[in-house]
């Protein structure tokens, strides 16, 4: 899932991710 990877990379880069789901991750 390309969108999942994009979300994961974005959250990892910001070091501000909250949780990972089947659809990606939620940033807070």
UniProtKB/Swiss-Prot annotation:
- Its primary localisation, in coarse terms, equals secreted
Q: Which organism is it from?
A: Micrurus nigrocinctus (Central American coral snake)
Q: What is this protein called?
A: Phospholipase A2 2
Task: List where in the cell it is found.
Answer: Secreted
Q: Which GO terms describe its biological process?
A: arachidonate secretion; lipid catabolic process; phospholipid metabolic process
Keywords from the UniProt entry = Calcium, Hydrolase, Lipid degradation, Lipid metabolism, Neurotoxin, Presynaptic neurotoxin, Secreted, Toxin
User: Does the record's keyword annotation contain Transit peptide?
Assistant: no
- List, alphabetically, the SUPFAM superfamilies matched: Phospholipase A2, PLA2
What's the record's note on cofactor binding?
Binds 1 Ca(2+) ion.
Concerning InterPro entries, the annotation shows: PLipase_A2_dom_sf
Found, by tissue, as follows: Expressed by the venom gland.
Superkingdom of the source species: Eukaryota
Q: Name one GO molecular function term.
A: phospholipase A2 activity
Q: What does this protein do?
A: Snake venom phospholipase A2 (PLA2) that inhibits neuromuscular transmission by blocking acetylcholine release from the nerve termini. PLA2 catalyzes the calcium-dependent hydrolysis of the 2-acyl groups in 3-sn-phosphoglycerides.
* Cofactor(s) recorded in Swiss-Prot or TrEMBL: Ca(2+)
Please list the reactions this protein catalyses: a 1,2-diacyl-sn-glycero-3-phosphocholine + H2O = a 1-acyl-sn-glycero-3-phosphocholine + a fatty acid + H(+)
This entry carries the following GO cellular component terms, namely: extracellular region
Top-level EC class as recorded in UniProt: hydrolase
Reported EC number(s) for this entry are 3.1.1.4
């Amino acid at each position: 899932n390309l969108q999942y990877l994009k979300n994961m990379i974005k959250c990892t880069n910001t070091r501000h991710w909250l949780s990972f789901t089947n659809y990606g991750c939620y940033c807070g």
